[in-house]
Amino acid sequence: MPSNSKRSMAPPTNVSKQISATSTSKKAPTKPTTQNSIAGAKSTGSPETRTSSPEHMESPETPTATTTVNRKKQKRRQKQAARLAAERQSSNMPAQNGDGGHDIVADFSRAATQGQHAAFDNDDLDYTDDETHYSTQGQRGLQHDKNGVLHQSQEPSKRKGKKKKNRKSRSQSHQAEGSSTSMSTPSASLARPVTLPPLSSSAYRSAHKVTKDRIWNTSTHEERERIKEFWLQLGEEERRSLVKVEKEAVLRKMKEQQKHSCSCTVCGRKRTAIEEELEVLYDAYYEELEQYANHKQGSFENGAPIGAPPRLYQPPLRTLDRHSHHPVAQHPSRGRVQELPDDDEDLDDDYDEDDEDDEPYSEDELEDAARTTRADFFAFGNSLTVKDGILTVADDLLKNDGKHFIDMMEQLAERRMQREEDTQYAAASAAHQSMHAGHNHGPPLDEEEYDDEEEEDYDSQDDEEYEEDEMDAMTEEQRMEEGRRMFQIFAARMFEQRVLTAYREKIARERQERLIEELEEENRLDVEREAKKAREAQKRKDKKKLQKQAKEEERAKREAERAAEEAAQKALEEKRLEEQRRKKEEQRKKREAEKKAQEEERQRKEAERQKRLKEERERQAEFERKQREQKEREKKKREEAKKREREEKEAKERELREKKIKEERERREREEKARQEKEAAAKAERESREKAKREEQAAQQAAAQAAAVQAAKRASQSGPTHLPPGLQHPQGPSALQSPHFQVATPVVPKAPTPIRPRQPSQQGSHASSPRSQPAHVDISQTSSLSPGSVSTTIPGKGVSQAPLLHHPQPSAPLSPLGGVGRGSHTLGFSPMQSLNGLPTNPGTIPAMGPRMPMAHDMSMYTNHSGPLGGQYRGFASPDSIPLPPGITGPRHLGQGRGFQMEVGHTSLPFHPQPNAAGPISAAAPQSSQNSGASLTHTRQPSISFERNQHETQPQSQPISRPAPIQRPASTVPHDQHKDESKTNQQEIDELSTQLGSSALLDDSDIPLTAPPSQPLSSALPPGLPGAGRIGFAGPSLFSDHLGSSKPHFSLGAPGSGAGWAHNPFGSPGFPAAPSWGPSSGAGWPTNAFGILGGSHRAHTSRPVAIRLSVIQACKQLNTTSGTDSSGYHNVNQILRQVEQLNSPNESQIGLDEMLDICDTEGNPQNGGGSFIIKNEGPKGTFVKFEPDNNSISSSTRGSVVPGDIGSPVPGSSLPTPGSGSRQFATTNISPTTGF
């Protein structure tokens, strides 16, 4: 091992190196750049600058050196130093690279005179010595080619003048060295940093169109500025990633190169040492690079160049050829790193520039320099190329896939291993030689040619004249430091490649974005251009259109002028054309004759065609008629099937009804028997009371006779006085008999009016109406009601007042009961506490019982519009105050003398106690005896009220046949009474049909005799008395007196077992109630209230009910739609109307079911008429109802349209209690049969 004393020889070497580098940096002015740039320097210095290359290839020795020194090189260095000193003195310009070159020259002067290490004691000076040259000079000649690869921008004028010398120098170098691996010939496997993919030619063509844009400007200065800005914009993490990406790549490359190397232990240790050395070197390099980046940030922003990071060590760098026995002191060439492009053309241009560099030296000197560089890998002599006075080191490391770099790292590993062994063995030099003699093999090289040339170089070195020169061997530490320095140069080179690659990627992205924007701009311009062309074309069209219009107007004007001229000419030629007209007239007549003949022929053909069409229509009509007849036959078949089904159903119902009637008859017989027994007991009691009454009457008659005597005396003096019919004296005992049951309810007195009321007729009044009543009742009948009969009910009240002999209204006859019950205050009577034992409600009308319980707690009085008490005739309002017209609630019931209530308009069914004493029970025997004698022979009341059109009882009929005298109901058998009532009813109906609206018929009108014209009562099944269609409106033509008995509805005495019917309000009548008195057979009419709330179609089959509802819905829609309607209605609208008419408790009707029923043929049972169904596709299906003779609209009951003859007055309908949505409707379409 050489001792450390040999280090004293290093300063001159470094000083000379610095002189060379300083002179190079001064003579070759460069611009500031960043460390992102790549070495591609362009020299502009003088020929003296090129002398640095030979100087760097040799290492001078001081005179005190023990080894021999190459005198030629020493002389050359002395000459170069003298020239540099002269140039420094003559140069007044400061260094332009900003790397402290002036300080380096000063330090070199001091080092030359003093022989010290001043230049190497300053890190900054040492940094600016190599890396600054490398980084600052690298970007001067950079330009991008079309593929994104940098190349040197050479001046064309220099290339032509330098080609010859460059080729000559290159041939001499080949002859001297015999190597193909120098930097003059690039390897095929040159390791280069990753570059961006080339842009397309179209992109570059579009890029060259906008050369003024900054993105496409490729000038070196602006590009360096952009690289600087790019580096400043990078964050800490991005910078770190750019730096640290090299370590793994180098290690991976090392492993790939050493795959086929020796597998001995020494080589394995060597590989491990190489990896460890790389780890240490990269870690130190990364740390210093980060520190330097942070330290140089300010100078970078101010425009100062950024070079490689400061070196870890700055010892004097000397090389020692360990493979040669003749060591020669060599100095590793250092300078700015320069990138060599891949293409051969650029390489030739580089060599053109190199011609100028070799001028100051002779060919022999270059050959000597080439030979001396083969001594050791650390000398890098065989791979260094002179480029404008700049030695490329990193390019050599990249050649041959980094083989030189790997060799360098192996050398470092060997040195490291040697140091480890030297610590163990003292003999450093001998051990070193012996160890490497046995293991002097490295990884196989990729190119055999290179190996051969290397061996030739080494062999030639042994035979050269340098054998006599002794190289001063460097210490191991110096060799290691030199290797580290070379590694730093390599790492800086690779780092710059990474930064430049990132910058190129950014520029490529920006260019691509700009290209996209330009393409979009071109597209937009194309669209605008097309739109502009379209507008211009439209303008041209409009212009042509205007021109054409102007031409048309001008042409029309010319034609008008021409027409005027022609008219003038025609006027002139009129005479000339007269003869021609005559000729034409003859010809025209001839043509007309021909035309007439043709017309006749055409008419004949047309007649034939019409005839054929008519026959075709007839055939079509016949076909349609047959189809219609077939359809009608099918309908008839269906109707017959339905009719048979209905008849079977009716037969079953009839049998069921007959069974019920039989059971009811047996029950009634039992009840009648029980009632007769009760009546016998009541008769005995009544006889005892009548005996007491007769005794009292005898006393009263005595007093009355006395008064009559006095009155006769006064009458004989004053003459006879005419009394009203109501106050005449009874003619005999028969006058006390009443044909009706006497109800103890006073008649509501009429309000006095200023005009004279109509005097009731006394002649023929008994025969004027079937329902007329006796015109007068003897006053003595009133006297028959003794106060004693009332005293049992009203104890403590005196009733011995004289009978009222003057009626408030002379024309109105008195009630048969006289003043009893006319008012609670008129005769001093207090309000009746009970009626035959029934308790009365306080505050209600006198002599009226409390509300009776009804089914489902239903209200007895519906729709009260006035105070209770004025609703019914014979029940006076409180204090006998008459109610004004129109505020009487339900209509007043027309009722005659004797309180005969009309069936169907009767008042409340009372339940009197059987043994209660009262004024009504006193007259019970007489009413029970003669009730059937004059039942219907009563006077029609003078008052009138609006009656429903469906009630068949004539109102105020002036002419009517009186009913025949009948036996009392109690003595007439049930069947006989029913037959007589039916006969009487038919006679009355015959009489009624000749009056009313029938009298308005014309002689030509055919009266309809369809079953709907029959009274409603005839449609009821046997056993059901006639029921009115509205509550309290039973048929009034039934002459049922109060004692008549009907099955299911007799009102017998208490305990008779009479109860409600099967349907409380669905069938006529109320439950049987005890009679007013003990008389047998006495009771309310069986259908006192008629059908209360029940549906009038309770027993109608569902198809018939649905058809009737559809008919009614069509009529209502016709009424609401007006006269312009065609009568067709949408089926959905009809269905909604039918649902409104139906009761909620009825089952839902479907659309298909309704349409099927509309296809059925009409008959008197289902409403008649026919339906026309029309299907209009998307509009829907429409139905029209056409009535016929069987339809309800042509019956005597009329239609439901207000205003027709026989239609009800809208305010005359009385609602009836009960369930169902149609209980208040004037339903007149129910069939009389078909239950």
From Swiss-Prot:
Pfam families: NST1 (PF13945)
Biased composition (Basic and acidic residues): 517-539, 549-697
Compositional bias of kind Low complexity: 20-34, 179-189, 426-437, 698-715, 1206-1221
Disulphide bridges: none
Signal peptide positions on this chain: none
Extent of Acidic residues compositional bias: 340-367, 445-475
A GO cellular component annotation in the UniProt record: cytoplasm
Protein family per UniProt: Belongs to the NST1 family.
Task of the protein: May act as a negative regulator of salt tolerance.
Protein name: Stress response protein NST1
Higher taxonomy: Eukaryota, Fungi, Dikarya, Ascomycota, Pezizomycotina
